[in-house]
Amino acid sequence: DSITFSELYYKLEADDHDNPAFIQAGNGVILSMYTRHSRKDLFINRLDATSDFTFKGAQLIHPWSDEELVRFPRMTMTYANPFRLEKENDRIYCFGRWTGFKPNMMWSDDHGQTWSDSKVFITNYPFDSNNRPYVKYFSDGQSRIHIVFTDGHPRDESTNSVYYVYYENGAFYK
C-alpha cells in the first residue's frame, strides 16, 4: 500500500475561509470546492475514484448573476459548503458567502458539471453590504439541509441572535 498526494491548486491560501470541502456526486466522482478569501473565485476540482485518484485541474466558476448584483451590490467569494440530497435526484447544493456579502446558494443537477446562478437567501432590509451573517450548515444527505446563522459578525452586532432554518424540497422552514 502507498499514499498518493494530489495538489488541488498551487495558489490555495492557508486560510480557513478557503478550506476545500469534498462531496461525492451521485455518479461516483468526488468534487472538491473552495474559494480564495474575499476574492471573486470559486473553484471545483474533480476526482474520478475509478481512475488514478488524481484531481483534475481546477475549474474556475463565477456563479453570481448581474440581477443579484444589482439587488445586493457587493461581490466576494468566501466559503464553499456543498451537500448532495438523494431525494432530490442527487441534486448538489453549494452554499457560501458570495453576492452581497451574504449567504448564497446554487445547485447542480448534473453531478457538478454545470451550476445555477447563485441566489442570496439570507439578508437584512434595508440591505447593508457591510453586514455578514455567520452560518453553519449540516445535511442528512437525503432531503434536508439544516442552517444556523447569526445577525452578523460578533464584533459588529451588539445584540447578536442565533437563528435556525432548514431547507427541504424547494423551501425554507423555521
Language model: regions and residue ranges:
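Extracellular, repeat-based ectodomains that mediate carbohydrate processing or recognition
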Residues: 1-174
